[in-house]
């Protein structure tokens, strides 16, 4: 059982996927920090708000100065500011991945065409092997 597991893990695609997941998680943390610590404060200055994460609606109609105060009171809230942060995070990650894939596709070499292994018989237009001297379909002689 251990041998099968080792064989499974050592396959190239499993290791590649593991590395991709680890790098993706680290990249996600960088983007989250960028959204939370850099982008959101700049955007909130333009909107006159200090912090997106403090944008919320109290569903029972009461008023609370902060989201933490509303949570401490145990009321139901609609936290649209936190949602906006997550949406910004997703958009930046998705766009970054798009740019990376686009760059990788440009760097990817075009695959070489497969070697030609057949030719056409001049008499019957059938496909025959390149080394054939006689057509298997019509029997006519074919120049090599």
From Swiss-Prot:
Keywords: Cell inner membrane, Cell membrane, Ion channel, Ion transport, Membrane, Transmembrane, Transmembrane helix, Transport
Localization: Cell inner membrane
Membrane topology of the entry: Multi-pass membrane protein
Parts of the chain that traverse the membrane: 14-34, 81-101
Gene Ontology MF annotations: mechanosensitive monoatomic ion channel activity
InterPro entries associated with the record: Mechanosensitive_channel_CS (IPR019823), MS_channel (IPR001185), MSC/AndL (IPR037673), MscL_channel (IPR036019)
Cellular component annotations (GO), alphabetically ordered: plasma membrane
Keyword Chloroplast: no
Taxonomic superkingdom: Bacteria
Subunit description: Homopentamer.
Function: Channel that opens in response to stretch forces in the membrane lipid bilayer. May participate in the regulation of osmotic pressure changes within the cell.
Family annotation (HAMAP family): MscL
Family per similarity comment: Belongs to the MscL family.
Matches recorded under NCBIfam families: mscL
Name of protein: Large-conductance mechanosensitive channel
Organism: Bdellovibrio bacteriovorus (strain ATCC 15356 / DSM 50701 / NCIMB 9529 / HD100)
